[in-house]
Swiss-Prot record:
Gene: lacZ
Molecular-function annotations in GO: beta-galactosidase activity; carbohydrate binding; magnesium ion binding
Subunit structure: Homotetramer.
Species this chain originates from: Yersinia pestis bv. Antiqua (strain Angola)
Entry cofactors: Mg(2+); Na(+)
Descriptive protein name: Beta-galactosidase
Keywords: Glycosidase, Hydrolase, Magnesium, Metal-binding, Sodium
Residues the record lists as binding substrate: 100, 199, 467, 543-546, 610, 1025
Site note Transition state stabilizer, residues: 363, 397
Gene3D superfamilies: 2.70.98.10, Galactose-binding domain-like, Glycosidases, Immunoglobulins
Organism taxonomic ancestry: Bacteria, Pseudomonadati, Pseudomonadota, Gammaproteobacteria, Enterobacterales
Family as reported in the entry's similarity comment: Belongs to the glycosyl hydrolase 2 family.
């Protein structure tokens, strides 16, 4: 008997954790039901599939009870078109909500709010009589959030929840030739929402593909493919377990079941490698006999080509179901990779080799389409990861779109497949995992994931979920996986990352050398962890290096440890992409939004933006740091006479057959000697390369650097030709300096001019009155204020060059890492920004303590002392000595003394606002991208030139940005600065960055703001909620000195 809509809704299935589905078919790998072997082998589109993607009719209600009963049979008058797949919140209905830990609904499991946003979808489609003449028709929803009911032609079909796994239903009894109508009622909240508390945008709707699939009456029901390699990896067995759907009344009739045959053909491109055919049936399982609806086929393969992320060689297995006349009923096909995953002697090994995981966590996210991801976006992520030396990705924190795994198989990425389970907002987190009434809901999310995805070679580890504590359910599901798929290890971080439910120590945000002894679940340093008594598992960080905004400091320390300790086998960076959504302001202009921008409450503001790439996949500077730290070639300088380097390949399987070594000896950013040669390295091998017999003799003084890089001359499936995969730089010892005759002649030529300059001492003039001190040289005049003691103006030809005077700067626009977990409603006194606020660093009162002028024989010297205090407490003392010489240069020596009561400042430097705006910035120092004292592994010393706008890093949440470290020369327009300093140059002041909430709200200011730092604190990045700048990168001394030389070229 068909139930009415009110009767169905009255059961409130979405508030019953023991009801996760009605009439949903069992999980299995993706099916295509090809009707010819060639199409299956070549992976052609299957005529048995019909997409239902496109425009659907959509009506929105605030709660399911408000849906009119007749909607299941016909569209409502107010219905409007809505694309599928899509999140309805991005099409004007309801609002996306971003939260990290806290649930977006009151925590009362399994209850959810009565006001439960509901989307009513419907679509008509047409089926020919031939489609319905025989067989069965299924409908497959690849992803619907969070729960839904399905009707076909007015009749209720079923119910499902779990947003991230397919829901498949048999539509055969409800279909008719011609026009058909399906209706889907989607609930935003369900008891399943309590298991989906991931750190992400909470959105709803049919956000993955929908399609019809036609299967024969007798058809393949499940296929499980495993590869087993010999100890020497010289041969392999391909094991295929296949089950067939046969009517139950025929299962015990051997004449019926035995008439069906299963055939497996293994192809390598167009070459048939092996084939095996046998009838249905297994060996006797117990005293009642065998299975009659399934069989096991084993093919032996000699000298198989192995699959790895480095060499993702794929075979193609075609599984055919044949009738008693040997005619094909249907075929399914899967890519097969021969590879072995094992933990042996404390090491995770791929094909017998200990692997170093160069991993990243990735949410399915697109700034325009939210959680609806297309193939182009999937492929873009994979190519970028491969190009930046990633070899692994964790599906955080749910099973991904089915196409993701196929692409990872083909392009070569190791995958941690993770169940769609997180209960982070529960107290305790294990509240539900220890509750038997929730066992079914937990278990289906794990078992169905395994059943869908287990044929993919890219998946090397199963994960039981994320941040859900540790309960009896986890132990049970761990054992289920180990029984049903003994070919892969299982990891689970909950409960301390080292419970019996994990084969791998997989902590998150454990530090290299620092213990975090939390009472319940201590996080030891990763070096200490692997040395604990009776602990022999490998350690792979499931999350580390929190890349939130201007972050990622100290990342290189992890990689030093990974390479030093074999059982530290890498980790997964948090995370890949800034989870910002495109929003529009009142004028219709787009901008990248974060939590709260949609009026969503509760929200966790900008905590959704932790990516190595911006939402449009353009790189953060931290991406280059990851690329360099993770590069597969390591370099060492053995000698300089002759010039010899050693290169080690960290590839486990591939030869360096597409690599060219390029080297250059650089003098102050200019090449003086260079060369290239092919790189011929076997896996895991080292080789010495003799680059030159000796260092070149120089005809001018300067510092020599040796730059080496490895490029790939030919394009690959994942990279263009000349892709740079690795690089390094060394500072070389100073060679002999032998001035050339040209230089000698040049000196002689300019000697009269130099002599003339010596005679122009009267051009350096000094004027003083009660308000100002002026130093004049030719067309330039430096004007000091006696009141402030500061350089108030720099005149050139009576034109003012400064919009704001030159002064000390000790603060920066707070980084996310500086802010930590401090916000309006919660203050973390340990956060750097709170320590600086409490100390008064943002409200310093400056006083000029003294001002002295000396007119020397060849220069004018002005000495000034400044005191900085807060609430009458002296905090900083700054002593500046300005020297003006007869060449129009201003040299400043700065000495800063810091009170012992003051927390370490963010910077010791100076700033001013220049009147000039020049299109280009040139410098000799570290570059070309933004770098900071604890994030400069990827930067190289050289001569760089960039447009002014590219000197600003457009972090969505504005903060300190754009620094370039270890600079010796800066040229900006007619300005030249020399010394040993860091600098940042921008159209935005520190003050504007501090008070502006979004990048798009920044307004270019008049002129240019120039920040010159003698010293700058690191940015940190082990995590973003506790102080994570390493002690070596904190300004802890009591005194600091630096010197800058300024010149304006008139």
């Amino acid at each position: 008997m068909q139930l009415s809509l009110p009767q169905i809704l009255s059961r409130r299935d979405w508030e019953n954790p023991q009801i996760t589905q009605y009439h949903r078919l069992e999980a299995h790998p993706p099916f295509h039901s090809w009707r010819d072997v060639e199409s299956a082998q070549k992976d052609r589109p299957s005529p048995q599939q019909q997409t239902l993607n496109g425009l659907w009719s959509f009506s929105y209600f605030t709660q399911p009870e408000a849906v009119p009963e007749h909607w299941v049979r016909c569209d409502l008058a107010e219905a409007k078109p809505l694309p599928v797949p899509a999140n309805w919140q991005l099409h004007g209905y309801d609002a996306p909500i971003y939260t990290n830990i806290q649930y977006p609904i009151p925590v009362n499991p399994p209850r959810v709010p009565d006001l439960n946003p509901t989307g009513c979808y419907s679509r008509d489609f047409t089926l020919e009589p031939s489609w319905l003449a025989s067989g069965k028709t299924r409908i497959i929803f690849d992803g619907v959030s969070s729960a839904f009911y399905l009707w076909c032609n007015g009749q209720w079909v079923g119910y499902s929840q779990d947003s991230r796994l397919p829901a498949e239903f048999d539509l055969t009894p409800y279909l008719q030739a011609g026009s058909n109508r399906i209706a889907v009622l989607v609930l935003r909240w369900s008891d399943g929402s309590y298991l989906e508390d991931q750190d992400m945008w909470r959105m709803s709707g049919i956000f993955r593909d929908v399609k019809l699939l036609h299967k024969p009456e007798i058809h393949l029901r499940d296929i499980h493919i495993m590869t087993h390699l010999s100890p020497e990896f010289t041969s392999a067995n391909l094991e295929v377990m296949a089950a067939v759907n046969i009517p139950s009344l025929q299962l015990n009739d051997p004449q019926v079941t035995g008439s069906y045959q299963l055939r497996v053909q293994l192809w390598l491109a167009d070459k048939l490698v092996a084939s095996l055919q046998q009838p249905l049936g297994t060996q006797a399982i117990d005293e009642r006999g065998p299975y009659t609806d399934r069989t096991q086929l084993v093919l032996r393969i000699d000298q198989p080509l192995l699959w790895s992320a480095e060499q993702p060689t794929l075979y193609r297995a075609v599984v055919s179901l044949l009738n008693h006349q040997q005619e094909l009923i249907e075929a399914e096909a899967y890519d097969v990779g021969f590879r072995q995953v094992a933990i042996h002697q404390g090491l995770l090994k791929i094909n017998g080799k200990a692997v170093l995981i160069r991993g990243v966590n990735r949410h399915e996210h697109h700034p325009q389409t939210g959680q609806a991801i297309d193939e182009e976006s999937l492929l873009q992520d994979i190519l970028l990861m491969k190009q930046h030396n990633f070899n692994a990705v964790r599906c955080s924190h749910y099973p991904n779109h089915p196409l993701w795994y196929r692409l990872c198989d083909r392009y070569g990425l190791y995958v941690v497949d993770e169940a769609n389970i997180e209960t982070h907002g529960m107290q305790p987190m294990s509240r539900l995992s220890d509750d038997p009434s929730w066992f079914s809901a937990f278990s289906e999310r794990v078992t169905r994931m395994v059943q869908r995805d287990r044929n993919h070679p890219c998946i090397i580890i199963w994960s039981l979920g994320n941040e859900s504590g540790h309960g009896a359910t986890h132990d049970a599901l761990y054992r289920w996986i180990k029984t049903n798929d003994p070919t892969r290890p299982v990891q689970y971080e909950g409960g301390g990352a080292n419970t019996l439910a994990t084969d791998i120590l997989c902590p998150m945000y454990a530090r290299v050398d620092e213990d975090q002894p939390f009472p319940a679940v201590p996080k030891w340093s990763i070096k200490k962890w692997i040395g604990l008594p009776n602990e022999s598992r490998p350690l792979i960080l499931c999350e580390y290096a929190h890349a939130m905004g201007n972050s990622f400091g100290g990342f290189a320390r992890y990689w030093q440890a990974f390479r030093q300790y074999p059982r530290l086998q890498g980790g997964f960076i948090w995370d890949w992409v800034d989870q910002s959504l495109t929003h529009h302001n009142d004028h219709g202009q787009p901008y990248w939004a974060y939590g709260g921008d949609f009026g969503d409450t509760p929200n966790d503001r900008q905590f959704c933006m932790n990516g190595l790439v911006f939402p449009d996949r353009s790189p953060h500077p931290s991406l280059y740091e990851a690329q360099c730290a993770q590069q597969f070639f390591q370099f060492s300088l053995l000698s300089t006479t002759p010039l010899v380097i050693n290169i080690t390949s960290e590839y486990l399987f591939r030869e360096s057959d597409n690599e060219q070594l390029y080297w250059r000896i650089m003098l102050e950013g200019e090449s003086v000697l260079e060369g290239s040669q092919p790189l011929n390295l076997s896996p895991e091998s080292s080789q010495c390369y003799r680059l030159a017999e000796k260092l070149p003799t120089l005809n001018k003084p300067g510092q020599l650097w040796l730059n080496v890089e490895i490029r790939q001359p030919k394009e690959t499936p994942w990279s263009p030709a000349q892709h740079r995969s690795a690089w390094h730089q060394w500072r070389l010892p100073q060679p002999l300096f032998s001035p050339s005759s040209d230089l000698t002649n040049a000196t002689a030529h300019y000697a009269p001019q130099l002599q003339h300059n010596l005679q122009l001492q009267h051009d350096l003039q000094l004027q003083q009155d009660e308000q100002h001190i002026k130093v004049t040289y030719q067309q330039q005049c430096w004007q000091f204020s006696r009141q402030t003691g500061r350089l108030a103006q720099w005149w050139v030809a009576d034109k003012p060059m400064l919009l704001r005077p030159l002064q000390d700067q000790f603060v920066r626009a707070p980084l996310d890492n500086d802010i930590g977990i401090s916000e309006a409603t919660h203050i973390d006194p340990n956060a750097w920004v709170e320590r600086w606020k409490k100390a008064g660093m943002y409200q310093l009162q400056q006083r000029c303590l003294s001002l002295h002028v000396d007119h020397l024989s060849h220069s004018v010297q002005i000495s000034a002392e400044y005191g900085y205090e807060f609430e009458q407490e002296p905090l900083l003392h700054s002593h500046w000595v300005y020297r003006f010489d007869r060449h129009g240069r201003m040299t400043i020596d700065v000495n800063v003394r810091i009170a012992t009561s003051l927390p370490a400042p963010a910077r010791i430097g100076m700033c001013c606002q220049l009147a000039d705006i020049s299109p280009t910035v040139e410098w000799l120092g570290l570059g070309p991208h933004e770098n900071y004292p604890d994030r400069q592994l990827a930067a190289q010393y050289g001569h760089w030139s960039l447009p002014l706008e590219q000197m600003h890093t457009a972090y969505i949440f504005p903060s300190e940005n754009g620094l370039r470290c270890n600079t010796h020369t800066l040229n900006y327009g007619r300005w030249t600065l020399t010394g040993d300093f860091h600098f940042g140059i921008s159209r935005y002041s520190t003050q504007q960055l501090m008070v502006t909430s979004h990048q798009h709200l920044l307004e270019p200011e008049e002129g240019t703001w120039l920040n010159i730092d003698g010293f700058h604190m690191g940015v940190g990045g082990d995590d973003s909620w506790s102080p994570s700048v390493h002690i070596d990168d904190i300004l802890t001394r009591e005194t600091y000195q630096y010197q800058i030389c300024w010149q304006y070229k008139v």
